[in-house]
Amino acid sequence: MSQSSRLSALPIFQASLSASQSPRYIFSSQNGTRIVFIQDNIIRWYNVLTDSLYHSLNFSRHLVLDDTFHVISSTSGDLLCLFNDNEIFVMEVPWGYSNVEDVSIQDAFQIFHYSIDEEEVGPKSSIKKVLFHPKSYRDSCIVVLKEDDTITMFDILNSQEKPIVLNKPNNSFGLDARVNDITDLEFSKDGLTLYCLNTTEGGDIFAFYPFLPSVLLLNEKDLNLILNKSLVMYESLDSTTDVIVKRNVIKQLQFVSKLHENWNSRFGKVDIQKEYRLAKVQGPFTINPFPGELYDYTATNIATILIDNGQNEIVCVSFDDGSLILLFKDLEMSMSWDVDNYVYNNSLVLIERVKLQREIKSLITLPEQLGKLYVISDNIIQQVNFMSWASTLSKCINESDLNPLAGLKFESKLEDIATIERIPNLAYINWNDQSNLALMSNKTLTFQNISSDMKPQSTAAETSISTEKSDTVGDGFKMSFTQPINEILILNDNFQKACISPCERIIPSADRQIPLKNEASENQLEIFTDISKEFLQRIVKAQTLGVSIHNRIHEQQFELTRQLQSTCKIISKDDDLRRKFEAQNKKWDAQLSRQSELMERFSKLSKKLSQIAESNKFKEKKISHGEMKWFKEIRNQILQFNSFVHSQKSLQQDLSYLKSELTRIEAETIKVDKKSQNEWDELRKMLEIDSKIIKECNEELLQVSQEFTTKTQ
């Protein structure tokens, strides 16, 4: 069986009979070792390193996932966001939990809900796109783009925090500083810049920088990088620099200095004041050179692709003619908070244009792969691989050497990955030390081995993964059920509710009175068709439940057989265990009897010692002449030893003084004549004699110390 077939056979990926009728999603995190699979309003989660069986949670009490919803995952993989045009649900994936059958526990995992109809007053604008802020602490910030081009930040873990709305209309006459016709959003890979793709004039790129959550997740390396960039920009200011630019750069340096002061090194986070979160849009970016033939087309999507393990990235924009342009930000822009229509160093350089000859639906990047972009079309997924030149470009940037770019060809490799209809997303799966790409639609799920395309992992990471795997392997008896019992109970509850609920289609009383055989029976046929569809859905649910119960019964029979076999093995070892137990009992009894004898002797000895201690005979007995002589000798030896110690200390001080004098004399007598050299030789001889004397004294002290030790024993 191939690697992809074994991976497809994992229980977590087994589809129900109604799976083709509902959308399915797959996500991964922590280098592809944590997997989340969604189908039939059930979240399944599975840790490759620690779990032997996947776990599941039904969220149908809160929403019914249909084709109107989109699902995204946070970078950490801890949160899922499900949204449509009117509502947003954020749910926590219960990593570490195995039993979440209780309703109150299930409700606790829905941590945020937003509804336009409930929250907004006045004109309502539908939701266009939602992103998790990649640098928010505990994934607590989501960014929402609406049809009216406003961008809202929600703190999903703090209900008291009011949402921050950017790019609002100013409701005044004259030029409006906001950006209209925003079709897509994307964060930079450092998480501090939000790119906006504007289609008013075909395809302009704007940016919010900095775009910050209420609590910013920042490590020391990134913090120092921001500070260094700010210092370089500040030092580059001169008399010709615009006043507005100077003000923004100075404010940026002050802001970054505050980040350093308030940074929590333990948790790697820093609180951001509201005034620094109200950034103003800047741009548009210049694209040099811009392909002339694209002036007649409109941009559709924007994405950022990491090209190394640092922060060097490529900005990719797709157009409705099937073109991709790959751009590089060649200048460092400054932060802007209070200046409208601000433009400074908003520059992008065109590196390559890729023509795909088909309509592009979406662009997807995987954090585990560098320099690769997945392009989703109607029924095909393609990979654009530009590592052939991106690695050289990254090296030139890091080493500040542009010479290798002279003969470099900027040509990306285009490869067809698979032909699948309606691909909502894809994920990277790390299973059995193999890298796999999971491609999913409502009807199919395929895996492709991409181990040869992956970036090399560090030895330490591999060691930690293998260690964790070995730690999780136990010798105990393990169940081999492929589906958790709570998931079967959920299917049963859904089926029971469907059985007792009436049909959604209500037959008018007038139609009920009409005989079935009549010339105008189209209405009756339509009613019967709708009712039959409802019953077919219930039949599918019943079949799904029946198949699950059937498989469970077979697995339980198999488990019963395994348990009986294990029980028989244990019973067969009973005689050997009894014999060993009797032998060990005899040894135990012998040790107990010996211990009791020793305890008896010890008690007798303690009684004698207590009698001696209490006896007046020993208390009144005088010390003998020999004992007094022995104690006096010990006292004399101690005094003599102490005097030797003091003498040795004095000699050591003399020696150190002589050494210091020797050093001083050596420094002063670099240029001496013959006579001085003779005197120096005599001094050295004297020092050697003194050194011998000191050595003899040390030997005598050592001998006396040994004699003293011998006498005192």
Swiss-Prot record:
Coiled coil residues, start to end: 582-713
Transport as UniProt keyword: yes
Stretch list, region Interaction with NSP1 and NUP159: 463-713
InterPro entries linked: NUP88/NUP82 (IPR037700)
GO biological process, one term: protein import into nucleus
Primary subcellular site in the record, as a coarse category: nucleus
GO molecular function list: structural constituent of nuclear pore
Cystine residue pairs: none
Cellular localization per UniProt: Nucleus, Nuclear pore complex; Nucleus membrane
Keyword RNA-binding: no
Key words of the record: Coiled coil, Membrane, mRNA transport, Nuclear pore complex, Nucleus, Protein transport, Translocation, Transport
Region (Interaction with NUP116): 1-409
GO cellular component: cytosol; nuclear envelope; nuclear membrane; nuclear pore; nuclear pore cytoplasmic filaments; nuclear pore linkers; nucleus
Domain of life: Eukaryota
Membrane topology type: Peripheral membrane protein
Bipartite nuclear localization signal (motif): residue ranges: 607-623
Reported function: Functions as a component of the nuclear pore complex (NPC). NPC components, collectively referred to as nucleoporins (NUPs), can play the role of both NPC structural components and of docking or interaction partners for transiently associated nuclear transport factors. It is specifically involved as part of the NUP82-NUP159-NSP1 subcomplex in nuclear mRNA and pre-ribosome export by acting as a linker tethering nucleoporins that are directly involved in nuclear transport to the NPC via its coiled-coil domain.
PANTHER family in the record: NUCLEAR PORE COMPLEX PROTEIN NUP88, NUCLEOPORIN NUP84-RELATED
Subunit structure: Component of the nuclear pore complex (NPC). NPC constitutes the exclusive means of nucleocytoplasmic transport. NPCs allow the passive diffusion of ions and small molecules and the active, nuclear transport receptor-mediated bidirectional transport of macromolecules such as proteins, RNAs, ribonucleoparticles (RNPs), and ribosomal subunits across the nuclear envelope. Due to its 8-fold rotational symmetry, all subunits are present with 8 copies or multiples thereof. NUP82 is part of the NUP82 subcomplex.
Note: Present with 9470 molecules/cell in log phase SD medium.
Name of the featured protein: Nucleoporin NUP82
Gene name, Swiss-Prot/TrEMBL: NUP82
